[in-house]
Design a protein with these regions (language model features):
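The feature encodes the CheY-like receiver
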Residues: 14, 56, 84
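Acidic catalytic/metal-coordinating carboxylates
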Residues: 32-36, 59-62
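AAA+ ATPase active-site-proximal loops
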Residues: 132-168
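Active-site beta3 strand of CheY-like receiver
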Residues: 44-50, 55, 77
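Two-component/phosphorelay signaling modules centered on CheY-like receiver
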Residues: 11-29
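Active-site residues of response regulator receiver
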Residues: 8, 52, 80
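Short amphipathic alpha-helix used as the core "switch/output" element in two-component signaling
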Residues: 39, 54, 61-72, 90
Length: 168
């Protein structure tokens, strides 16, 4: 059906939303901060992000700009416990698909995820979205090998990766 990333620092609500959305057939990923969310965005490439407005390491309203810059076809729905109209307006201006109040009893969440998913799929098809150069994150995790030669190669690659020098 599609992939949804939920970013919320309230663990209980995060698990509840994850279960609820997962039961609808979506693959769900969880993060508790903007930083962890960005890592999962790069690794899993979800079509929809459901993000809390207030996170320990940043504002969800501002985080929308970062997400849309790196992943323009990913739709972002912001969750808030505070129905602040000015935050909602700013979120939409920053590129959010929608802005909704938190609560496990909010019957609008699942239909809203479905709408956001449809929109994201449409955007991916229309724009043939690709990652921007800024969105490409490469790591050295997962490289198998502990020999001194491999460790030297990884060390050198890490040093060179911080520069703009072409490497063959």
């Amino acid at each position: 059906m599609g992939k949804v990333l939920i970013i919320d620092d309230e663990k209980q609500l995060l698990r509840l939303l994850s279960r609820m959305i997962g039961l609808e057939g979506y693959t769900v990923y969880e993060a508790e901060s903007c930083k962890a969310g960005l890592k999962l965005l790069a690794l899993r490439r979800p079509e929809v992000v459901l993000c809390d407005v207030r996170l320990p390491d940043g504002s969800g309203v501002e985080f929308v700009k970062d997400i849309k810059k790196l992943y323009p076809c990913t739709e972002v729905v912001l969750l808030t416990a505070y129905g602040n109209i000015s935050d909602g307006v700013l979120a939409i201006k920053n590129g959010a698909f929608d802005y909704i109040t938190k609560g496990d009893d909010n019957p609008k969440i699942i239909p809203l995820i479905a709408k956001a998913m449809d929109s994201a799929v449409r955007l991916y098809n229309e724009k043939n979205c690709q990652l921007t150069d800024e969105g490409k994150h490469y790591t050295f995790e997962g490289i198998v090998g502990n020999s001194p030669a491999i460790q030297d190669a990884i060390s050198l690659a890490k040093k060179v990766s911080q520069t703009d020098v072409p490497v063959l």
